Design a protein with these regions (language model features):
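Alpha-helical transmembrane segments and their immediate juxtamembrane cytosolic regions
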Residues: 1-250
Length: 250
């Protein structure tokens, strides 16, 4: 098919530039996750649990930022997003179980996939979208103990979308949902017993959404390597790399 220079220029003019702040947020979320998982390599570093509390809310905020863009609210774009999450949910489960000793939950991607369906049901009035969102909430309620971050983890991407364009202090409300997603009863009990990481972990959960929103709004001049679809593979890959490191140390 012949494409004129004028058509190419028209398409180029309508392409949105990449958001460097959003890419930076994704890289920082990945770094926080890796720091958290270093606790399972063999080092005595329970304090890494604290920066690890930033990872999930920042991934949820990145999802909300992507879905807030006009071009990703189309049905096709969001189905592709869901497809990638479901594909790597399956691909990542075996590396996840190889690395994490006796996991009580699935890997984090099923939680994000259900969260995507909830957001999609909120954004689109179509009956199918609303039914899928209701089904996602039902599954999250029934299988909350099997989902990483549970029922509130499924809600967190939607909450992030609600506060995305609101004043900064709404991020602190999202922080309450983040605390609930991180087993607040366990953290509260650990804090009462004097666990040195519990109170900083609660604080990290509370401020994580606000920190992420601050970054997206004020780090516009950064230009980190863009995170594209290949980045999904980093999730199962980091389990295998850390597993190899643990075996090498042992």
């Amino acid at each position: 098919m012949h494409v004129t220079t004028q058509e190419i220029m028209h398409k180029a003019m309508h392409l949105k530039p990449r958001d460097g702040a959003l890419d930076l947020l994704k890289w920082l979320a990945l770094l926080s996750m890796v720091l958290d998982h270093l606790r399972y390599v063999g080092f005595s570093a329970d304090w890494l649990y604290v920066p690890g509390r930033l990872a999930f809310p920042w991934f949820c905020l990145a999802m909300a930022a992507n879905l807030a863009r006009e071009r990703t609210t189309t049905t096709g774009g969001q189905w592709r997003y869901l497809g990638w999450l479901l594909l790597f949910s399956a691909v990542s489960e075996i590396p996840y179980r190889m690395f994490i000793p006796h996991p009580d939950t699935l890997n984090v991607l099923p939680t994000l996939a259900l969260g995507l369906l909830v957001v999609r049901g909120w954004q689109q009035p179509a009956l199918a979208s609303r039914l899928l969102a209701a089904g996602a909430l039902l599954l999250a309620g029934i299988f909350s103990e099997r989902l990483m971050f549970g029922f509130f983890g499924v809600l967190l991407p939607w909450v992030m979308l609600l506060v995305f364009r609101r004043p900064w202090y709404f991020g602190l409300l999202a922080g309450l949902v983040c605390v609930a997603a991180n087993q607040w009863q366990v953290l509260y009990h650990a804090a009462r017993l004097g666990n040195h990481a519990a109170i900083p972990a609660i604080a990290a959960c509370l401020i994580a959404p606000w920190l992420g929103l601050f970054l997206l709004r004020h780090a516009k001049g950064v230009n980190p390597p863009p995170m594209r679809r290949w980045a999904y593979a980093l999730y199962p890959a980091h389990f295998l790399i850390l597993l190899a490191l643990r075996q090498a140390i042992a």
